[in-house]
């Protein structure tokens, strides 16, 4: 018979960051984010709390990793998809991920710096719009209009409080950003330094709110002008089949 001490040591040996992070997701899904602490997570894993700190520095790093798990559940669009269907699929998949993990939206609001996984996701979203013919400036406004928090990041990605002057040499961090996330770097350069931006440097909440409202109203007006039978999408997002349409 295996002694309890040996079982405990074996369990600790198998512990790694992925297991810790996924266990955190499971606890938050099951009992809510308020119930999650390093101690309750350790109890759930059957280890001492200090064992967790070998894999995550603190609860903040744990939460970052948990959000990365949620982002990893978001489907990638099929290769060759047009921008509209690609972005639509991405957003709908993101919505489903957030519905599966209701705590995630709340945690997103507390993040001050996106993780590399989040930055890669943002960069891919921007790339879809740029490849669809959107200018960097319009891409910036499109992200606001579509709802930045649905993508898993806050406006801190575009925080301009400590930005350099337009003529300053780019920092090592900026150069690294440009090499790793070229679409983000391009858009940030435009919205901070390009006079062609409709808003000017940084983000104007009132402008973005009004633009999103106008886009929504324009879209509703366009939908209103369609024939009645074409207005209501089916659950999958496409027009309802003929048999499902209301009869006159």
Where does each model-flagged region fall?
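Hydrophobic alpha-helical bundle segments that form small-molecule/ligand-binding pockets
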Residues: 121-173, 190, 220-224
């Amino acid at each position: 018979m295996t002694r309890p001490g040996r079982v405990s040591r074996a369990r600790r040996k198998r512990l790694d960051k992925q297991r810790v992070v996924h266990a955190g997701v499971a606890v938050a899904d099951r009992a809510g984010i308020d119930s999650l602490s390093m101690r309750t997570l350790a109890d759930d894993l059957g280890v001492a709390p200090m064992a967790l700190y070998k894999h995550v520095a603190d609860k903040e790093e744990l939460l970052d990793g948990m959000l990365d798990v949620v982002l990893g559940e978001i489907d990638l669009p099929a290769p060759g998809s047009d921008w509209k269907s690609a972005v639509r699929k991405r957003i709908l998949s993101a919505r489903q991920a957030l519905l599966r993990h209701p705590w995630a939206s709340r945690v997103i609001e507390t993040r001050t710096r996106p993780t590399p996984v989040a930055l890669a996701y943002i960069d891919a979203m921007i790339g879809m719009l740029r490849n669809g013919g959107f200018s960097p400036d319009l891409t910036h406004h499109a992200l606001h209009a579509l709802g930045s928090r649905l993508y898993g990041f806050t406006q801190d990605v575009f925080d301009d409080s400590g930005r350099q002057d337009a003529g300053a040499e780019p920092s090592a961090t900026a150069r690294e950003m440009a090499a790793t996330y070229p679409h983000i770097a391009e858009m940030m350069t435009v919205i901070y330094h390009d006079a062609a931006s409709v808003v000017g440097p940084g983000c104007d909440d009132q402008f973005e709110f009004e633009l999103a409202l106008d886009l929504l109203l324009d879209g509703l007006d366009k939908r209103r002008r369609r024939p009645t039978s074409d207005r209501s999408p089916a659950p999958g997002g496409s027009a309802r089949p003929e048999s499902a349409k209301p009869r006159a």
